[in-house]
């Protein structure tokens, strides 16, 4: 059967994370149930996990389907009807048989949305309300993040990782309408890494943590801060792959 790479978007506030939980709703379970209702029992393979409350606009998942290319448009439309309203397939691409996007992804990117203005009841699950502080100090701290670093002091306590070394390729802070947006792009991320980084950067902006202290924690010398920002403002927004994974160049809309 053809292996497809699906790019998903989902409302993380409706799920207890992307991975299957014992008794709680998850993105993977919702997708598996949607596929099963169409007679597809394929294993679903995610490019990476997102925790409870974290959203995605471009999560990558692979699975096999018993449909020929001419039927993929119909398949996507029918599947989205079953996934509505919290989960949606945006695009489908054919890839080489059996590939796992977790191991094939060359980079991932996240955005974190913050508002200094009071939020409406409808926005509180999608944006974090907090005081930013000094933008220039935060930008200086974010420049320190670019490159290879040992993020051992910016990960979830107790999480098991073969290596805590990651390459931060791009990161910056910018203004979008009434929001502040933190952008991070790396070859991979540790659990809670971005939320811990945002929490520390906000401490720097407010003058509660010096640039030198931030640098020491980044160099895994000493922990000054270990409280992560809330999950609600965090979005997985991009997963990139080498061109060699694609079976064909044409894409299905």
UniProtKB/Swiss-Prot annotation:
<keyword id="KW-0819">tRNA processing</keyword>
<dbReference type="InterPro" id="IPR020095">
    <property type="entry name" value="PsdUridine_synth_TruA_C"/>
</dbReference>
<dbReference type="InterPro" id="IPR020097">
    <property type="entry name" value="PsdUridine_synth_TruA_a/b_dom"/>
</dbReference>
<comment type="subunit">
    <text>Homodimer.</text>
</comment>
<feature type="active site" description="Nucleophile">
    <location>
        <position position="51"/>
    </location>
</feature>
<dbReference type="GO" id="GO:0160147">
    <property type="term" value="F:tRNA pseudouridine(38-40) synthase activity"/>
</dbReference>
<protein>
    <recommendedName>
        <fullName>tRNA pseudouridine synthase A</fullName>
        <ecNumber>5.4.99.12</ecNumber>
    </recommendedName>
</protein>
<dbReference type="InterPro" id="IPR020103">
    <property type="entry name" value="PsdUridine_synth_cat_dom_sf"/>
</dbReference>
<comment type="function">
    <text>Formation of pseudouridine at positions 38, 39 and 40 in the anticodon stem and loop of transfer RNAs.</text>
</comment>
<dbReference type="Pfam" id="PF01416">
    <property type="entry name" value="PseudoU_synth_1"/>
</dbReference>
<dbReference type="GO" id="GO:0003723">
    <property type="term" value="F:RNA binding"/>
</dbReference>
<dbReference type="InterPro" id="IPR020094">
    <property type="entry name" value="TruA/RsuA/RluB/E/F_N"/>
</dbReference>
<dbReference type="InterPro" id="IPR001406">
    <property type="entry name" value="PsdUridine_synth_TruA"/>
</dbReference>
<feature type="binding site">
    <location>
        <position position="110"/>
    </location>
    <ligand>
        <name>substrate</name>
    </ligand>
</feature>
<keyword id="KW-0413">Isomerase</keyword>
<comment type="similarity">
    <text>Belongs to the tRNA pseudouridine synthase TruA family.</text>
</comment>
<dbReference type="GO" id="GO:0031119">
    <property type="term" value="P:tRNA pseudouridine synthesis"/>
</dbReference>
């Amino acid at each position: 059967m053809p292996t497809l790479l699906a790019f998903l978007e989902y409302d993380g506030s409706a799920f207890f994370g992307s991975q299957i939980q014992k008794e709680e709703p998850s993105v993977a379970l919702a997708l598996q149930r949607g596929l099963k209702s169409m007679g597809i029992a394929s294993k679903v393979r995610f490019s990476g996990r997102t925790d409870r409350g974290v959203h995605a606009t471009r999560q990558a998942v692979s699975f096999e389907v018993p449909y020929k290319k001419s039927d993929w448009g119909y398949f996507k439309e029918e599947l989205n009807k079953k996934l509505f309203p919290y989960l949606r397939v945006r695009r489908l691409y054919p890839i080489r048989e059996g590939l796992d996007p977790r191991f094939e992804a060359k980079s991932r990117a996240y955005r974190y949305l913050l508002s200094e203005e009071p939020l409406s009841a409808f926005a509180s699950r999608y944006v974090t309300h907090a005081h930013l502080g000094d933008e220039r100090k935060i930008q200086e701290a974010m420049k320190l993040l670019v490159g290879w670093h040992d993020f051992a002091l910016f990960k979830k306590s107790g999480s098991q990782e073969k290596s805590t070394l990651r390459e931060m390729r791009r990161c910056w802070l910018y203004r979008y309408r009434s929001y502040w947006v933190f952008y991070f792009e790396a070859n991979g991320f540790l659990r809670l890494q971005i939320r811990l980084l945002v929490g520390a950067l906000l401490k720097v902006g407010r003058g509660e943590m010096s640039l030198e202290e931030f640098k020491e924690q980044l160099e895994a010398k000493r922990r000054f801060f270990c409280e992560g920002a809330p999950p609600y403002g965090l979005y997985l927004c991009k997963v990139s792959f080498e061109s060699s994974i694609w079976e064909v160049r044409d894409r299905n809309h």
